[in-house]
Regions:
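Extracellular glycan-interacting surfaces
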Residues: 2-386
Length: 386
């Protein structure tokens, strides 16, 4: 791994060291970068980032990471996929320095489904239930844990939804890649599936309905179906939980009614194709996207590394380029490879398929490169931890 921009490599991952934050009660920023060949963890104190010297799970692709800061002690979760042993979910209670894999698979399909787990696409700590974690998988399914991610149970009503027989895989497989919970109501859950679209429950998962009105499916004979959209990612607004942002396979949308109706907000972007979207952690109406040229040309729009930000819920967009390469850039950002932390000003982060990781400590106004020459970056998560 190559590091730059005021970043220093950390000590060997097997050594347990006391951080400055632990020693004097300070907080630090934690950055987890899941790649095609392991999980890289960076820690920031006093403006300096230090990456642990070697990756965790270096023989596995890490498709999903969660940093659960709800309890007295943060817990990290990672969805790894070993070419030999298959997929698994690991957890760490010491900020990623050591990891535990349950004796029995945390996520598995019941025998009567006839399905087998291919990978865990999403790990999501519930907003209103302290011990609940959701997992989204491939084949597309939703799982619920009530022990902070050590064991999960299949949410059968979604698995058995009447439309399931008509779901088809997207280019990256048939994955449930987005889970959003509502801090106002633990029974309200929104998920997104590629390629099936957005589905919602208002009764804790007992029943589900498609929520794709206004979202296009340009590749289907009917471009406005009830379900079947290739939704790439959905994020929830910080100030208004009913406002959502959606990056589609062609099209960027917002909803002001929790997904009942969607409005196209792509005007002002150089392309409406892309994978990633993220919401500002505190500021309402503020979200980020990373435009890609086209579905047949999956490189940054105009070959320039540009994050676009809206501060008015999609009425206008501004490019954020300070510190980012603007010539001959080909690093595509995947759906879970952009995120924000919960700092103020907010940290914004993304990694790309060139193995580069960039970070902003000022809401996206300026950027610096944290790492280069990593394996293909699949997911990025960050948080302020004690």
């Amino acid at each position: 791994m190559t590091v730059s921009g005021g970043v220093q490599t950390g000590r060997w991952l097997g050594q347990r060291r006391q951080s400055t934050a632990e020693a004097i009660g300070m907080t630090e920023k934690l950055l987890a970068v899941g790649t095609r060949k392991g999980l890289f963890i960076g820690r920031e104190r006093g403006g300096t980032w230090a990456f642990d010297e070697s990756p965790y799970f270096n023989a596995q692709a890490v498709y999903s990471v969660a940093i659960d800061t709800r309890g007295a002690r943060p817990r990290l979760l990672a969805g790894g996929d070993s070419a030999h042993w298959g997929p698994s979910v690991f957890h760490s209670d010491d900020l990623g320095r050591t990891w535990t894999e349950p004796a029995q698979p945390a996520v598995k399909f019941p025998k009567d489904t006839g399905a087998s787990l291919e990978r865990v696409w999403q790990l999501h700590p519930a907003a209103a239930e302290p011990d609940v974690v959701y997992a989204g998988t491939e084949p597309a399914a939703l799982y619920r844990s009530e022990d902070r991610g050590e064991s999960f149970e299949l949410v059968r009503p979604l698995w058995e939804h009447p439309t399931r027989s008509k779901w088809v895989p997207g280019g990256g497989g048939e994955g449930l890649h987005t889970v959003l919970t509502d801090k106002r109501d633990p029974r309200a859950v929104t998920v997104a599936v590629s390629t099936a679209g957005v589905f919602r429950t208002a009764d804790g998962g007992a029943s589900w309905e498609p929520s794709n009105s206004g979202v296009s499916a340009v590749f289907l004979p009917d471009p406005n179906p009830e379900f079947g959209q290739c939704v790439h990612k959905v994020a929830r607004d910080a100030a208004d939980p009913d406002r959502l942002y959606l990056q589609n396979h062609w099209g960027v949308y917002t909803s002001d009614d929790a997904g009942t109706h969607w409005t196209d907000i792509g005007e002002g972007l150089p392309s409406t194709f892309g994978f990633a979207t993220a919401a500002h952690p505190h500021r309402g109406g503020t979200a980020y996207v990373f435009p890609i040229n086209a579905d047949a040309d999956r490189v940054p729009a105009g070959h320039r590394c540009r994050v676009f930000r809206t501060a008015d819920a999609g009425k206008s967009w501004e490019p954020l380029t300070a510190g980012l390469p603007q010539e001959d850039h080909y690093g595509t950002v995947l759906r879970d490879a952009m995120c924000t932390d919960d700092a103020d000003p907010a940290g914004v982060y993304f990694g790309n398929r060139n193995g580069e990781v960039y970070a902003s400590a000022d809401d996206g106004d300026s950027w610096r490169q944290l790492a280069s020459h990593l394996p293909d970056v699949l997911c990025v998560r960050a948080a302020v931890v004690a």
